[in-house]
Amino acid sequence: MIDRILIIILSVLCLCTFSGSCLAESVTPAPSSEPSISVSTSDEAVGTIADPLEPVNRAFFYINDKLYFWVFKPVATGYKAVIPEDGRIGVHNFFSNVTTPVRLVNCLLQAKFKGAGNETARFALNTTLGIAGFFDPAKKTFKIEKQEADFGQTLGIWGFGPAFYIVWPILGPSNVRDTVGYVGDLSFDPRTYLAYYFVIAEIVNAGTWVLDKLNETSLTLGEYENLKKAALDPYIALREAYSQYRQNKIRK
């Protein structure tokens, strides 16, 4: 399962890089155009991320937008009507607890040893006192905050730049670094190995992924609508918001 995912995503990245290079060679930029298309080795303090695949990205943005309003939002709204907020927060806590190894390993890779210790303590407390992670006594009782750490962030701290912007179908906004980081995080996620070794677990894993995303959507309904309403160009607004969000996570 992991090998298949790696091959598919890395193949797409190679195609994207080749396409971006061809586009860069065929177009002579005007003096006031976007920054030149290049793979940077570090995050830039200011400026817009390169977007050589903008026509393709806009097409995927349009598809994702329609999927959200026609599929995800209606389903999430129905789910929200059936499951009370406390229950949905419990589901969120459960999946957050399951993916503790992702944050723990990345804290270690970033030399944030206190954060790694916090994640270890949180996992122990929430798995036991929190009933398999559905509750979060580590935060509420012991004041131990969850550490936000992922492999895309780790690569940024190591000095790798975002390269250029990518919009993936269903998954949404990303960049080259965060796409590689997403694949890296899959290797730290316990659910990946269950799906790899057990056929039935692969089906269950897909179901848990859908439930996780559905649950998260139900907890954030309205945020995307507000972004679209406030933006002259929602595509650019989302691109800039995502890029700034990721840069801020790396600088923490």
What are the residue ranges of the model-derived segments?
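Broad structural signal for hydrophobic residues in well-ordered alpha-helices, predominantly aliphatic
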Residues: 14-15, 79, 138
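N-terminal targeting leaders of membrane proteins
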Residues: 22-113, 200-252
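Mid-length scaffold segments of soluble, non-membrane domains
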Residues: 97-176
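Hydrophobic alpha-helical transmembrane segments and adjacent short intramembrane/lumenal linkers
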Residues: 157, 161-166, 173-206
